[in-house]
């Protein structure tokens, strides 16, 4: 069978880092992080994240687009200190969404719905009007929030805060930008918020809903001037609609006259319902989304491959990555999605030994927030490497120059599959996607015939035997506890798909035990009796009941 056609990749800057190295640079730390987010909808840490496009490069090189206008043309509209801040950041030309907002709104204080994709410069597009309105004579008293930005993830909140600090760097009066999201001490960060001067607050829905439950926090919003909902469709898609509606009931009412801005790539009914609360009738609708553009998941070449049993998927993934790298060895950058956080942790532990020639990263919900933030920054900056990830990055996160997305195991839904495919071929670049399944999971392409998924053109299954020895040696370096956690997560995840997998509970345990044998476990890892009961597997033969606590 012929090898897959070679891909023509855009020229990218070459850059450093050996195998398993770390990249330098982390996002700017905002002034406060208002702590631990309450339980969120079960979308494995729900969703999109920071705009990873190199915005500085985009704004400074837009001169190649004849319609792009320089920010300097807005000298009669924007305060000089804002223009100085943009210049200091290296932002010379407006992106299309910035140009739309800054030149087509009836006034910079007008309500609007703006359709724009992730990575197009939306952050600056909503920050400039909101901040300009404050500079025009609407600055709040010290300690009051004037601009509230609600976004779906902590990573995006950090990115917005970083750009905000850049835009406001040259203001004559310091303008603090605070953030509110989970992952740090609630008490200490809330104290920083209450003792500081949070003119701008960027928050995720769960954490913001939580802190607004306290009256002394609500009092900080009495001089609100602008409310921005960023990535509104992604936010509601992740299940945050109830929290967003509750937030809008707790802040001053729309009748107080604050400006509403809603940014969203699409406008489903749920977004329009929220927009009715945030916007006055007669709001302006702006869009930079081409209605005739082919969606990413339709234009990205997509393939699947399957192996007879689940234990062979580790060797199959190893063979696939090496085959893909052989086809495109320059700046090879890939994301491998696993089905569970503990499963992803196992993949990282395995392949840093099995594929030592590659620089590897991990990103999942079992990691601390500082570790996730650091990894996000490192993989964005990396010119090559493999990120093993769960769906903390499945929706909306934008890593530059990812040429390959691999999904290992059964996606939980067609929507999840599509969102993951969308992590490649960003910003007009090339990319492809491969789904790796074992025999029982191979129904997925058949029941999704509308998706352009084709058989992988190289017989990867035939290459499995030559990879198995290396996989066995690599697993000898993986801690037994990591294997046990991945085994238990495998059981729990696949228990929800028994009907689709056409497995009984006994057969599921048999498959899971094949999975554990492939990890080098002499017997199935121990599982607590209570955990087995919660999984609905009480009395199923083949399980090894006991405690792993020492």
UniProtKB/Swiss-Prot annotation:
Top-rank taxon, per record: Eukaryota
Record domain Helicase ATP-binding: where: 103-285
EC number: 3.6.4.13
Record field: compositional bias (Basic residues): 1-11
Residues engaged in binding ATP: 116-123
Keyword tags: ATP-binding, Helicase, Hydrolase, Mitochondrion, mRNA processing, mRNA splicing, Nucleotide-binding, RNA-binding, Transit peptide, Translation regulation
Residue interval of the organelle targeting sequence: 1-41
GO molecular function: ATP binding; ATP hydrolysis activity; RNA binding; RNA helicase activity
Occurrences of domain Helicase C-terminal (ranges): 316-472
Main location: mitochondrion
Motif (DEAD box): 230-233
Catalytic reaction annotation: ATP + H2O = ADP + phosphate + H(+)
Annotated GO biological process: mRNA processing; regulation of translation; RNA splicing
GO cellular component: mitochondrial matrix; mitochondrion
UniProt xrefs under InterPro entries: DEAD/DEAH_box_helicase_dom (IPR011545), Helicase_ATP-bd (IPR014001), Helicase_C-like (IPR001650), P-loop_NTPase (IPR027417)
Keyword Cell membrane among UniProt keywords: no
Family membership: Belongs to the DEAD box helicase family. DDX18/HAS1 subfamily.
Role played: ATP-dependent RNA helicase required for mitochondrial splicing of group I and II introns. Also required for efficient mitochondrial translation.
Notes on the domains: The Q motif is unique to and characteristic of the DEAD box family of RNA helicases and controls ATP binding and hydrolysis.
Protein name in the entry: ATP-dependent RNA helicase MSS116, mitochondrial
């Amino acid at each position: 069978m012929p090898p897959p056609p070679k891909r023509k990749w855009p020229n990218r800057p070459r850059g450093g880092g050996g195998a398993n190295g770390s990249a330098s640079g982390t996002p700017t730390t905002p002034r406060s992080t208002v702590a631990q987010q309450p339980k969120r909808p079960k979308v494995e840490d729900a969703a999109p994240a920071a705009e990873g496009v190199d915005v500085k490069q985009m704004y400074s090189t837009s001169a190649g687009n004849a319609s792009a206008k320089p920010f300097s043309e807005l000298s009669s509209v924007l305060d000089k200190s804002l223009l100085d801040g943009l210049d200091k950041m290296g932002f010379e030309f407006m992106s299309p969404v910035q140009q739309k907002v800054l030149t087509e709104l009836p006034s910079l204080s007008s309500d609007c719905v703006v359709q724009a994709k992730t990575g197009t410069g939306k952050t600056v597009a909503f920050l400039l009007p909101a901040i300009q309105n404050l500079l025009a004579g609407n600055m709040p008293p010290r300690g009051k929030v004037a601009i509230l930005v609600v976004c779906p993830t902590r990573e995006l909140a950090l990115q917005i805060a970083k750009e905000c600090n850049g835009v406001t760097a040259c203001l004559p009066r310091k303008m603090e930008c605070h953030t509110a999201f989970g992952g740090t001490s609630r008490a200490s960060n809330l104290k920083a918020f209450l003792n500081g001067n949070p003119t701008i607050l960027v928050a995720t829905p769960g954490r913001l809903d939580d802190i607004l439950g306290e009256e002394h926090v609500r009092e900080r919003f009495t001089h609100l001037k602008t409310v921005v909902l960023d990535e509104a469709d992604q936010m509601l898609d992740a299940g945050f609609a109830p929290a967003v509606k509750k937030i809008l009931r707790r802040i001053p009412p729309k009748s107080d006259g604050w400006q509403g801005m809603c940014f969203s790539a699409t406008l489903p009914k749920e977004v329009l319902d929220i927009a009715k609360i945030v916007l006055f009738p007669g709001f302006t609708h702006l869009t930079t989304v081409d209605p005739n553009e082919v969606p990413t998941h339709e234009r990205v070449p997509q393939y699947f491959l399957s192996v007879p049993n689940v234990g062979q998927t580790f060797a199959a993934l190893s063979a696939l990555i090496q085959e893909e790298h052989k086809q495109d060895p320059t700046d090879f950058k890939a994301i491998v999605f696993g089905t569970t956080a503990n499963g992803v942790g196992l993949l990282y532990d395995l392949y840093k030994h099995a594929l030592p020639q590659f620089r590897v990263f991990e990103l999942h919900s079992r990691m601390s927030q500082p570790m996730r933030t650091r990894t996000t920054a490192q993989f964005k900056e990396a010119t090559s490497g493999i990120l093993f990830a769960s769906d903390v990055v499945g929706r909306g996160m934008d890593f530059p120059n990812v040429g390959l997305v691999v999904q290992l195991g059964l996606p939980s839904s067609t929507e999840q599959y599509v969102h993951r495919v969308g992590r490649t071929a960003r910003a007009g670049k090339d990319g492809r996607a491969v789904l790796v399944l074992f025999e029982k999971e191979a129904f997925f392409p058949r029941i999704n015939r509308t998706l352009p998924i084709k058989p992988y053109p190289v017989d990867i299954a035939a290459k499995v035997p030559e990879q198995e020895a290396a996989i066995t040696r690599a697993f000898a370096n993986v801690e037994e506890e990591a294997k046990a956690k991945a085994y238990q997560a495998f059981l729990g995840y696949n228990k929800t798909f028994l009907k689709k997998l056409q497995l009984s509970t006994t057969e599921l345990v048999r498959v899971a035990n094949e999975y554990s044998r492939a990890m080098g476990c002499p017997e199935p890892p121990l599982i607590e009796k209570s955990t087995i009961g919660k999984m609905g597997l009480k009395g199923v033969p083949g399980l090894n009941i006991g405690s792993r606590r020492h």
